[in-house]
Amino acid sequence: MIFQDGSKVSMANTGIFFHYQEGERLRDFPDALEGILSRDNVFYYDAFYPGKPPTDYDLELIPLDLVWRVHSYDMVERVRRTHDFDGVMLSVSGTVAASRRVWSGEIDNAFVFTGYGDHHAGFDSFGGGCYFNGVAIAIRDLRVLFNARRFAVIDTDAHHGDGSWEIFKDDIDVLYVCLCHGGGFEENNNVNVNVPWRVSDAQYVDLIKKNFAPRAAAFRPEIIFWNWGYDGTKGEYGDIGLSTASHTMMARELKRIADEVCRGRIIVVLCGGSRRDMAQRLIPPLIRVLTGE
């Protein structure tokens, strides 16, 4: 497909990973994906639950020893004692399952619904609605299972991914680029890009083009993870002035980058955002971009 600005998006097989402990903001899903789930190039994975007939697309829980490869034993035990633990494990399992299937070529890209975010979870700390760092766990898993070597992570949540920064700052095989207010510094392959308090859609996408695209082209990751939050949208709790249209603009640019540098392998992991109506409005068109519509 060719858009008015001349950009192109290639068709792709897209996986959608969902479970039913997602919280109020995702109450309208998966019903809100009507017209998407019926496509031949869309594959829907969800958790097995009592009364659901087993299918080839069930989401299985990862073992805890995979979590311990990224987080301390004490931290895992603290999370285990919370009432959110089951949903946390399903969220992380979705990210791991998506990365395995994208890597193996079963699907080209993926969107992972999570009830609990990623990027505030560090080695021994969690907060801000983030318990385990699913992207970091998925990266570790790909290294062990497939000998994968180079990864890129772009974070467009409105807040700094302090947990991801801590985990990746000394890892020379992970390019981590975070767009957030108060950025403007880098360490090894960790880059914080400063975003003004108020920013236009075009300015924000330009930050991706100038700060992530050339680094990804030079770094040549084998797969890209996108920590996507919609909390920076107008009317959300992290409002930085972005319109609802900005998210499909980001998706088109990041899919283009993935198509060019890593054979289209990109996994979108839902992070911040609280409004139910906003999720219903933003997520379906973003997934359509992944499919190549």
Set out the residue ranges of the language-model regions.
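Sparse, context-dependent recognition of short Cys/His-centered cofactor- or disulfide-binding micro-motifs
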Residues: T14, K52, E60, L64, ...
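N-terminal low-complexity, Ser/Thr- and acidic-residue-enriched intrinsically disordered segments
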Residues: M1-I62
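A general "terminal functional-core" signal
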Residues: H71-E293
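A general structural signal for well-ordered alpha-helical segments in protein cores
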Residues: L26, L64, V92-T95
